[in-house]
Curated annotation (Swiss-Prot):
Record protein name field: Hydroxyethylthiazole kinase
Metabolic or biological pathway: Cofactor biosynthesis; thiamine diphosphate biosynthesis; 4-methyl-5-(2-phosphoethyl)-thiazole from 5-(2-hydroxyethyl)-4-methylthiazole: step 1/1
Domain of life: Bacteria
Protein residues bound to substrate: 50, 198
Xref: CDD domains: THZ_kinase
Enzyme Commission number, as recorded: 2.7.1.50
Keywords on record: ATP-binding, Kinase, Magnesium, Metal-binding, Nucleotide-binding, Thiamine biosynthesis, Transferase
Glycosyltransferase in keyword set: no
Swiss-Prot/TrEMBL cofactor(s): Mg(2+)
Catalysed reaction equations from the record: 5-(2-hydroxyethyl)-4-methylthiazole + ATP = 4-methyl-5-(2-phosphooxyethyl)-thiazole + ADP + H(+)
Protein source organism: Salmonella paratyphi B (strain ATCC BAA-1250 / SPB7)
InterPro entries attached to this UniProt entry: Hyethyz_kinase, Ribokinase-like
Role, per record: Catalyzes the phosphorylation of the hydroxyl group of 4-methyl-5-beta-hydroxyethylthiazole (THZ).
Length: 265
């Protein structure tokens, strides 16, 4: 099935609801991107909470609006905490999102992520290599870097979405968002987004937060991808390199006006 182009008008409408709700987003993410992820959520209008201790994380998951599990710096003890927290979110019917960082390259995290799938994530966000590995269609990849084009992983993403009954996002030069039946494409962004650490992990947090919104989950998640692409483009236009891109990107998220972007593109 051919993907449809995501509508920016819908993304503008969704962003208004997102900012009004300010979803409380519980992030169990990796140590490298904690600050950038929290700042990304804040800049867009969400409320991040970086609660990781298992004593606190399990009960907190039941009161948050959404949960992100990112396995970038996974350890055995952290895996236990994540599993217990996901169980709490699942029991409380809180949507949770999986970011299976480097799932194809390392066996421990691959087995852990596959085990978590039984707890029905609302969304999965990964690059092409990660989605191919999680679906069982391929192993490998170079950690957080992808060795595959996003489009090559689309059949795997669609099959995984149908199997788990969730939204799957494959990110790349063009992002693809699918529920297994319908697929949306989101072009845009800028190569500078790949020259800093954390844009993909931060996107996963925004995807998680968007899953707390009412309405069609596919459209909400695609809108989240659209916001990040638009902010990346805007930031790159006033950046000289990776160092100046990060603050420009956060500013672009904070000032993001999708309707104005529609008028100029």
């Amino acid at each position: 099935m051919q993907p449809d182009l995501h509508c920016r008008t819908l993304a503008a409408h969704t962003l208004k609801h997102f900012r009004a709700l300010s979803p409380l987003t519980h992030c169990m993410t990796n140590d490298v991107v904690q600050t950038f992820t929290a700042n990304t959520l804040l800049a867009l209008g969400a409320s991040p909470a970086m609660v990781i201790d298992p004593v606190e994380a399990r009960p907190f998951a039941a009161i948050a609006n959404a949960l992100l599990v990112n396995v970038g710096t996974l350890t055995a003890s952290r895996a236990d905490a994540m599993r217990a927290t996901v169980e709490s979110a699942y029991d409380a019917k809180i949507p949770w999102t999986l970011d299976p960082v480097a799932v194809g390259a390392l066996e421990f995290r691959r087995r852990f992520c596959l085990d978590l799938l039984s707890l029905r994530p609302a969304a999965i966000r990964g690059n092409a290599s990660e989605i191919l590995a999680l679906s069982g269609m391929a192993l490998g990849g170079r950690g957080v870097d992808t060795t595959e084009a996003a489009l090559a992983a689309l059949p795997a993403a669609q099959a995984l979405a149908r199997q788990i009954d969730c939204i799957v996002v494959v990110t790349g030069e063009i992002d693809y968002v699918t529920n297994g039946q319908r697929t949306l494409s989101i072009p845009g962004g800028d190569p500078l987004m790949t020259r800093i650490v954390g844009t993909g992990c931060a996107l996963s947090a925004v995807v998680a937060a968007s899953c707390a919104l009412p309405g069609a989950a596919l459209d909400n998640v695609a809108s989240a991808c659209c916001w990040m692409k638009l902010a990346g483009q805007a930031a790159a236009e006033r950046s000289e390199g990776p160092g100046s891109f990060i603050p420009a990107f956060l500013d672009a998220l904070y000032h993001l006006d999708v309707e104005a972007a529609n008028a100029t593109n």
